[in-house]
Amino acid sequence: MNHFELFGLPNQFELDGGLLSLQFRELQKRFHPDNFATSSERDRLLSIQKAAQINDAYQTLKNPVSRAEYILSEQGHDIRGEQTTMQDPMFLMQQMELREELESLPSSSDPESALFDFAENVTAMRKSQLVQLQELLKNEAWIEAAQSVRKLKFIEKLNQEVEQLEEKLLG
C-alpha cells in the first residue's frame, strides 16, 4: 500500500492538505500503540510499525518537495538523496546571483524592506516552480519533473537562508 492509498487520497501531486491532516489524525488514533497495550506482543509490534508508517507517510505527503520525490520514486525515478549536479547553467547562475544579492542585503540602506522584497521574489519563484512541477507530474513527464524538483530544492534552500537572515536582522 502506497502513502496515498494509506490516507485514502488520489495518487497525484495536488492534494487536499486538510483532508490529509484529518486522515492522519484518524489513523493515528486507530493505530496508536496505547490502544494495543493489552494485546499480544505481535499486535503491539504491528501497531508500532503501523504508527511509524503513518507518521512517515504523513511527513512525506505534507511537504510538496518530498511528495514529488515520492511520486517520482513510485514511477522508477528515485531522486531522494541523489548527488546529481544541476544541469541548467542559467538556473545555477540565477541562484548564484540571488545568493550574492541576499548576502548584500544587510548592508543596504533599508535591510528589512530589501529582505521583505527579496523574500516575496523567492516566494513567487517557489509558487511558479510548484505550478510547473504539478503540470509535469500530471503529464507524466518524469525526467522533467525530476529536474523541476531539483530546482525547487535550490529555491527551498534559498528560502531557508532568507529566514535565517530575517532572524538575524530582526531577532
Curated annotation (Swiss-Prot):
CDD domains: DnaJ (cd06257). The keyword Chaperone applies. Keywords: Chaperone. Residues 2-74 form the J domain. It comes from the Bacteria. GO terms for molecular function: ATPase activator activity; protein-folding chaperone binding. Transmembrane segments: none annotated. InterPro entries: DnaJ_domain, HscB, HscB_C_sf, HscB_oligo_C, J_dom_sf. One of its GO terms (biological process) is protein complex oligomerization. The keyword tRNA-binding does not apply. Disulfide bonds: none annotated. One of its GO terms (cellular component) is iron-sulfur cluster transfer complex. SUPFAM superfamilies: Chaperone J-domain, HSC20 (HSCB), C-terminal oligomerisation domain. Belongs to the HscB family. Interacts with HscA and stimulates its ATPase activity. Co-chaperone involved in the maturation of iron-sulfur cluster-containing proteins. Seems to help targeting proteins to be folded toward HscA. This is Co-chaperone protein HscB homolog. The gene is hscB.
